[in-house]
Amino acid sequence: MGRFGYAFQNYDATRHVRSSVREKDMSHKHAREVAVAIKGLSIEKARDYLQAVVNKDRAVAFRRYKNQVGHKADPGMMSGRYPQKTAREFIKVLDNLESNAEYKGMDLDRLKIVNATVHKGVIVKRFIPRAMGRATPKNNVLTHVELVAQEI
């Protein structure tokens, strides 16, 4: 895998800590909604929220990709889902972010997520053979996730 850059601009190594994961097999639409949900939270609150999503105690509000998505009973939420696979991957990125902050000597209680970016990655193209010599495409879009936290 080659070198990559970060989408976050104005990165200051003394104030910010960042972590990323590349080409993970998760829905980029779910990842976008989870990223919006955890932006602005502390690392501990984000981890608790994502663990509640995995346990199906709290839902993630779907604001952009909400067609045919049912309503949830969480306060202040219309459409929502429980993207468990995506939440598990985000917990791993948060763990990496926390270890990077410890390595830099930052105070973990004062860290706040200031940027959560999601990009589409490589498309893994496959096909399903059908009758009469036809084929149906079955594409899998991989996802890049970047998190940046800052000491507040």
Swiss-Prot record:
Keyword Ribosomal protein on entry: yes
Transferase is among the record's keywords: no
GO BP of this protein: cytoplasmic translation
Q: Which GO terms describe its cellular component?
A: cytosolic large ribosomal subunit
> CDD domains annotated for this entry?
Ribosomal_L22
Q: Which UniProt keywords apply?
A: Ribonucleoprotein, Ribosomal protein, RNA-binding, rRNA-binding
| Molecular functions (GO terms) | rRNA binding; structural constituent of ribosome
Q: Which family does this protein fall into?
A: Belongs to the universal ribosomal protein uL22 family.
Please describe the quaternary structure of this protein.
Part of the 50S ribosomal subunit.
Q: What HAMAP family would the database entry show?
A: Ribosomal_uL22_A
This molecule's function is given as: This protein binds specifically to 23S rRNA. It makes multiple contacts with different domains of the 23S rRNA in the assembled 50S subunit and ribosome. The globular domain of the protein is located near the polypeptide exit tunnel on the outside of the subunit, while an extended beta-hairpin is found that lines the wall of the exit tunnel in the center of the 70S ribosome.
Q: What is this protein called?
A: Large ribosomal subunit protein uL22
In its UniProt entry, the species of origin is given as: Nitrosopumilus maritimus (strain SCM1)
